[in-house]
């Protein structure tokens, strides 16, 4: 929720004379329109830092696995760089298919991870599903201990690979654990991702053409915020989203106005249609109960 106006011309000494950063001053021809843009981002920043985001899926980062292959003078292409690119492609695919997840750092798990019942806890968040990407060949001993305890309590682990190392050393115990279907749900990294594994009753999207849609959802005391963004600069995105709630409102980030937004209600669920122009966005508030006015 922070926008950084990158680069400022403090002087034109040295190499700076070859750079052409914008001048954020009345001298710029777009200055009179700049307030409208910054108000949009200010309202959006407030909205997307209010309430809390509560995702049920935790995707572990393969950081320690990549470090096993890292060498300063490695030729290109090299294994550690490829692993990073593959992992980025994996989580981007999840985002483009509207999977709600958080990323888990093993270093953070070391000090803030625990298991409570069938929930994998990290700080103030708790997860019912933990995902190990195909690039995860190693796990820290502390992470492996948490995963064993999580599985014993009935937690769901989805593994796209079989980690064979614990703290960088080959581990028969780890291989046996991740190969046990009673403890771990195996997913074939060579096959298309089965997104039904990540389905949640809280929210469901149709399949918008082109996979250009991204969304962000935050829980509030009396409802939830839903932000939709079209990442394409040339194509519109249209579709519907169904989520829990009884009434919807549009939060206009351009004008600051709040007004009703049409939705089809069935019981305690709303189906909302969206039509976003290229690079367009939509910020909605979905109330748990009907409200007047």
Residue ranges and their predicted role:
Residues 1-293:
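Carbohydrate-binding surfaces of carbohydrate-active enzymes
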């Amino acid at each position: 929720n922070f926008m950084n106006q990158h680069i400022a011309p403090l002087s034109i000494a040295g190499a700076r004379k070859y750079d052409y950063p914008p001048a954020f001053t009345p001298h710029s021809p777009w200055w009179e329109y700049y307030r409208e843009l910054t108000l949009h981002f200010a309202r959006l920043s407030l909205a997307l830092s209010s309430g809390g985001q509560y995702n049920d899926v935790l995707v572990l980062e393969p950081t320690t696995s990549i470090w096993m292959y890292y060498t300063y003078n490695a030729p290109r292409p090299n294994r550690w760089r490829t692993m990073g690119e593959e992992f980025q492609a994996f989580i981007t695919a999840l985002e483009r298919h509207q999977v709600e997840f958080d990323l888990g750092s093993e270093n953070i798990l070391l000090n803030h991870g625990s298991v409570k019942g069938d929930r994998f806890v990290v700080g103030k968040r708790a997860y019912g599903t933990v995902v190990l990407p195909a690039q995860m060949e190693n796990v820290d001993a502390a992470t492996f201990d948490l995963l064993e305890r999580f599985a014993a309590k009935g937690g769901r682990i989805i593994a796209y690979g079989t980690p064979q190392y614990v703290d960088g050393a080959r581990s028969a115990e780890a291989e046996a654990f991740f190969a046990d279907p009673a403890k771990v749900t195996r997913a074939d990294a060579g096959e298309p991702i089965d997104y039904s594994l990540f389905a949640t009753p809280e929210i469901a999207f149709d399949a918008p053409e082109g996979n250009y849609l991204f969304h962000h959802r935050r829980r509030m005391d009396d409802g939830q915020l839903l932000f939709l963004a079209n990442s394409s600069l040339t194509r519109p995105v249209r579709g519907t989203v169904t989520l829990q709630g009884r009434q919807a409102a549009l939060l206009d980030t351009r004008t600051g106005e709040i007004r009703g937004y049409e939705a089809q209600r069935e019981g305690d669920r709303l189906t909302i249609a969206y039509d976003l122009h290229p690079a367009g966005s939509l910020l909605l508030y979905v109330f748990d109960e009907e409200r007047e006015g």
